[in-house]
């Protein structure tokens, strides 16, 4: 009896936690300075099949800004830039030491509470030196929601933890 109860309990507990993965695309070239400012672009909205998730690009940029603001002297989102070229033009007018380009690779919002199919995200994050435009770090962060949910979960809920963990490695 205890063996069966243990198996059931482990299945339930494992379904109660979101899972995350980080796939670094390059080694971090140098640690970032916390005395420097960061400029973040706003990625295009996530799309799954024929569904465009409105505001997912804006939400992603804000979550990236939040993660960097814990370490940088300032972190700013620019809503009308989606790539490095645009950020570099904006950089000329400001004093940003680092340029961050997020890109939504996968964004899937599911009704997990009744379907059992988890929400999923995958976001590529590239960090550039604002002066030289050389890439100093790049990763792909992914997340999958917990199986046991009572509703109200969304893909953006999967962003803070992996973003925070990766950004921390850029500074520490």
What do these predicted ranges mean?
Residues 1-16:
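Sec-dependent bacterial lipoprotein signal peptides
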Residues 67, 96-106, 158-171:
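Short, highly charged low-complexity linear segments
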Residues 122, 128-172:
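Short secondary-structure boundary motifs at beta->alpha junctions and helix caps
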């Amino acid at each position: 009896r205890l063996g069966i109860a243990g198996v059931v309990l482990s299945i339930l507990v494992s379904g109660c936690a979101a899972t995350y993965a980080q796939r670094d695309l390059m080694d971090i070239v140098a640690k970032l300075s916390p005395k420097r400012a960061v400029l973040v672009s706003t990625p295009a909205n996530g799309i799954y099949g024929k569904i465009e998730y409105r505001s997912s690009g804006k939400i992603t940029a804000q979550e990236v800004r939040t993660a960097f603001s814990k370490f940088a002297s300032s972190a700013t989102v620019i809503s009308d830039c989606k790539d490095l070229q645009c950020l570099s033009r904006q950089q000329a007018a400001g004093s940003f030491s680092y340029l961050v380009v997020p890109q939504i690779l996968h964004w899937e919002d599911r009704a997990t509470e009744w379907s059992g199919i988890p929400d999923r995200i995958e976001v590529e994050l590239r960090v550039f030196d604002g002066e030289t435009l050389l890439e100093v770090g790049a990763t792909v962060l992914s997340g999958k929601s917990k199986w046991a949910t009572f509703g109200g979960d969304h893909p953006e809920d999967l962003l803070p933890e992996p973003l925070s963990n990766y950004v921390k490695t850029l500074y520490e």
